[in-house]
Structure formats: structure tokens, C-alpha cells
């Protein structure tokens, strides 16, 4: 079959347009074999290609710009072009394409909309082909399954401008619509418009927002179809908005739970979302975090694998029933005991679930591992599954997740691990149980995902920015990471000392060299289960806050990559550089303020005098925060913590931090204006330092960091069709908004953490449409908890944001909570996703009597126990009609349950 491709693209000298597709004649998706188009004017490019009809009859393709044999630009291809080739080999196609840039409404092309929110589950047939055909294609993703796109025009076949007689288009390739007309029966010139057509009522409801489209008399040969592609149709219909709920899987609680939420409970959560007209269920990371088998493993962002799921999320009932009645009865009793707890007992839950895994694996494992379904899963996931299973086995065998301490296999060798995982080895049963569990988890989550899609609900996942330094990835792919530093965050509303997550930072240069394959595989794996995701700490793709290994707090960190300052540049701001700026400033006059009654003890034990009067330095054995931490290990009394934290503060009291690569270059220490070394400067020096500080942290890096992000994020965010949401909180440089806007990434808007530093509270009516709005995240107190934290701030919110006079109530009443929720639902954001706790807060009967139990995480505490559980079951929640009716009504009133 002859297919002629034509595209209009104005190239520069030395550039050429190439086409790349899914069939051998178009390069078989190999960029090195992309087929060049020809041109006579550098604008109009074409090529006539003979294509053998593929088995499936479908060809996907895209256009690329090449210079010197390398692709320098690629059109938007998250939703690929697709042509359905007719069976008649004598037929030819002539396709007129337009270059596809990233659509302004790119979110509508995501799988969140095409597979769930606006899914067309029952697609119409491919249009009939004619001897002389005219095919018109158009993109219109904002159309739900009750409607279709139709063509109305100045032809009898197109209704002669009667919109109710318009020609319906096929949604076989939704969100692209197509219709083929019999060109032999058309009279040219052809004028037409797209209309929104109600299939049930068989009538048009809206004309597109465009002048008449015009097509002069095209030359169409016999046995040829002319394809007019890449049109876009827009209608004056209300902006699509939706509501959703955010809740960790571990927090879910049903009558069938085993002391912790599981993937079976996720389906029950979807049921509640459907019953209240919510469109999104957002969860936290669900990867395996098992390191010590203690409650410290409860931190969901410190995973040992970016692919493996945590075994505790397995729904035991779905794995099968134990045949031994006595053993089954024992587990039923334990299930009731654990499920009765108000908070998760992480250690007990995992211990008992593992007892069940061993029993059910002994009973069913051999049969499951021999099944065709498992073999298919294993072959598709072997690259990560075998190393993960081996790592987990060796971690328990050697009693440490730190593979550097293992007597064997400390350095990963793929061949050795392949041998270790062979079925004929003595260790195989200990390893194969992980295969078995992951297979079950895969099936259960996939079932929950399918269930959600079928019910028009989006599952939104969470991609952590970091990995554990004691993880499968650090073991198998250490070249991707800088293991001599710690990732974290500078001081913010969550933590005055910054956050130290302990994760290694990424070696972006190595990742760039192989096209970011590590990230691409990670995103693509996630797309198997989720239709939307939150990029945790999206700032990490611009720059990361890296903290030295000898530091505990985040204050001594620096941005990586960054543009450090030389002494000469520092002095150009009017600040005379001194070596003392690099050393902790410890002076007699403030020691009493910091240490109180412990001052003499500190002088005698931890610091020593210098040659300068009343000035001290840290003793060598305590001159880093890690050394201090080691000294106070296990000492948790109030006095020890007082002294320890005071010493941490002394060590971080420096004006500049040396660059991690070049010690002759410097970074101003973050937040130093609150410390004693800054106060010791004279007014002239303070003014000079403030100028330098402001330039460094808020202006200097904008273009530089934008370039860093644009190397990575475009191809990563377009590697799948998931809806992309960014967590852009904290210290946000201007370039973040530029990049997120360019890439159509949804921002996160939180009223009590406004993007404008001049405002105390965000203005809901000014939120960008392309955003997710919420009142609280898992790192924050809930609405009710926040209301009781700072009475003066609450009073200002009550008067200024809610518009009430007088004194604010001491607690957030259900009526006040409903008002706050309603205001958020009325915001401009496309999605309003509230925590389950904030939804429940609106009903005095159903909200938790103890507001303190609702907190999920306290970021300032690196050893926080993540154990929040719903205080009622999902079955009770489904029957909470007073609450559910209120939510349904609010969602409807605020336009977040659109009919079109």
C-alpha cells in the first residue's frame, strides 16, 4: 500500500524532517532508522512510502527534526498518530499532517481522562473506506461517552448546516475523532464546523469555537483517500473540575482488613469515592520499605525497591484460604485483634502477615509458580524481581540491609544472583516466596486499578524523589547515585532546621548519558497501575538540597547543581571575606542562652577556648553533628536532648559553606540570618550579606536550574500518559513555575502555604486552573489540627479568609469545616483533593473525636512512626449517609461533577 506523508514545518539550514513509526518501512521505532522526508522549499516536506499491511492493520508514527544525523526536536508523542490501513492493497493514502506541539490542554490526553474520567469504553467502528475518500481527523478529548464529535457543513451528507443532522465521527482512536466522506459525492469548496452531538438524544448541543473551516477542491485520485489531520475542536462548555480524596493505603480500615489497609480495601475506597461523586483516590508510596522489621520501616518514602510493593498491602483473603482449619482459625482471631487497634501496630501486623505468607506459600506456592500467568509476570519483571528477592533474602540472612557489610554478594554480580535464584538451589524457597508475594500484589493492585477505571475513578500514585542508600537500586546500579551525600530540604514551614532524608543524590550526568532509562522504566512501570501521579519534591529535578554525610540537620547543605561564589565575588557585594565565616561562631555571651544550666558542662566537655577572648571552638572529637549524635545515642532524657540540639546549632552557626567539589568556592548558609554569627556582623556587613544572599537564593540560578530541569522533565513526563502533578512546596525559585507551565504539569496549591511570600493565606479564586488544590497534606496537620495550633493565625484566617466578624471558635466546628471545604471546592483548580480526615471533619457524628490521632507525619521528626488509621471502617463510611449526602451536594453545587 502506498502512503504519502506530508507535513508543513519551517526548518533552519541543515535540518531535515524524518518520520518514525511502528512498521519496518518507517524504522520500526528505531530513531537511527527514521525515514527522511524531502522538500523543495524547506517548509513543505513529504515522502511516498510503500507499506506492507501489518497484521493488526494499524500504523503508529511521529515526526522528528534531525541535524547532522541526530534528533534535535521531537513532536509531542504521548498520544501517537495512528492510521488504520484498509485491507485493499490497491488503496492509497495521502496524509496532510501538522506538527504537534504539547497541547495547552495536555491533561485531557492523559490516561486519567481517556481511561477513567472521560473514558469511551464502547468505541465506534473504524470509518468505512470509499473509492475516493476524504477523511477528516480532529482532537477533542473533552467529550464524555454520552457525546460524540460530529461534522456539520454545506453538504447534504453533512446536514446542510442543520446541526441535528451532522455526520457523527468515530471515536475508535479517542481522543482523536475521524470520519471518512465519499469524495465523489461532495461539492467543493467544502465548508464545515465541528459540533458536540448528544448520542442519546440525537441532537447537537454546541458549535465549536472556530470560524467555518474551508477546503478548496483537492485533487483526489481513484482508490485514494486524502486525510486531513491534526485539527482541534473546542467548545464553550464549563471547565471540567473534579474532587478527590487523599488517604494512605495503610490507613484504610475495613471489616476485612488485617490491622492495616490493603489493596482489597482500595477497591472499597473507590466505592466510597463513587458514592460521593469523587473522581480521584490519591495514595502515598506503596513500595517495600522493609529493612529492620521494626516500626522504623513504616516510613513509606524510604523504599528498598522502586518496583516491589510492600508485602503488608496484600489482601490475604485474595491469596487463598488455608486448608488447615485450626491454623485458619488462629489467623482469624489475630485478624480481629489487630483490626481492633486504633493505630497500626507495624511490627505485629507484618509479623503475622508473614506467618500467613509462609503458610499459604507452602500450600499454594508450587502451583502458582508453575502457572502460565506467573511465568508471564516473571519474564516481564525479571530485571528487578530477581535482585529484589535476592536482596530481601540476603538482608535477613545477614541481619542488615547494608549490603556493604554482607560477607558475600556485597558487590552485585548479575551472574551470581542468577545462580542464587535458580530453582535447584537450597535457598530457592526463601527467595521464591518473594516472587510469589509480588505476583499476588501485582494481581491485586491491577484488579483495583481496573475496578477504579471501570467506575470512572482515577488512582493517583506518588513517586518519591529519593531512594534508600541501602536498597536494591543502590546495590545493583550504584553508578546512578552519589552515595557520599544526603538529600534533604532547606528550612521551610515543615522544619526550621531543614530536612535530612538520608537518601543519596542522583548522578544526573550518568543518567543523561543513557537517556534517563532508569527514570523512564520507573515511570512506565508505575503507569501499569496508576493514571495520575504526584512527583514528590519536583524541585529535585531542578536541583537537590545535598547535605554532607557528617551533618544531621539540613542547615549545612547546598544546592546541587549550583553556581557557588568565589571570595572575589563575595567581596564585590561589599562584604570583606574572612576565614572565620567558615567556622562555627561560639561566643561566651550567648552560651548561657543556648544551654542554660548545662553551660559549664558544655564548656568542660564539648568546646575549648581559642586565642581570642571569650571565643570557643568545638573539640575535635565533637566537631561534626554526626560525632555529637554518636555521643548522645540512646540518651533520650530531656537534658541530653537539650545539650545535643544546642551543639547541633553551634556547629551549623557558620556564614558560608564550602562547595562540595571546590573548597575555594562558597555558598551562603541557608537561613543564617537567625543565627549568632549573622548578628555579630556590623550593619554594613549585614546589608552586603543580605544583598548577596537574596541574589544567590532567589535570582542567580533561575536560568541555570531551568536548563537542568528541561534536560530531564520533558522526556520523563511524556514517557507515559499518566496525569502529571508536581509537589512544588517549600523554597520555590521562579523557574519552577516556568517549567511546570511549559510542560503542563499541575501545581499543588495549599491555602496556608501560599506561593506569594507577601501573603499569609492563598486566594482560592486566583489558583491556576492547571493545579491541585488541598488544605492539608500528609506532612501537615489536618484542618481541625491546624485550627488549634496557632490561635492568632486562626483568628486572622477566620476574619480575613472566611469573612466572619468577632472571635474565632477555639475548635473547628463541623460548620466551619464545611465552609472551608466548600470554599476549596469552589476554587479554580481542576482538581480539589482533600484528605479523608478533612472530608470527615464536616460531620460531628463521623469525625474522629481525638483530633491528635489524625496526624499522619511530622516532618521535623525523622523517626516518626507512620501509623495513622481510619477510626471507622469503610463499611461504616459507606453507610454514613448524613456525611455522604453532604459531600455529594457540595460536589454538585461547586461544579465538580460535570455532566458534559
Stretches with model-predicted labels:
Residues 107-131, 135, 182-185, 215-900:
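Catalytic cores of glycan-processing enzymes that make or break glycosidic bonds
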Residues 10-56, 66-87, 140-188, 197-220, ...:
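Aromatic-rich carbohydrate-binding modules that target alpha-glucans
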Residues 75, 83-88, 93, 97, ...:
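Phox homology (PX) phosphoinositide-binding domain
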Residues 94-107:
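Extracellular carbohydrate recognition and processing domains
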Residues 2-8, 132-139:
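A short, amphipathic beta-strand motif
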Residues 6, 20, 38, 64, ...:
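Residues in well-ordered beta-strands of folded domains
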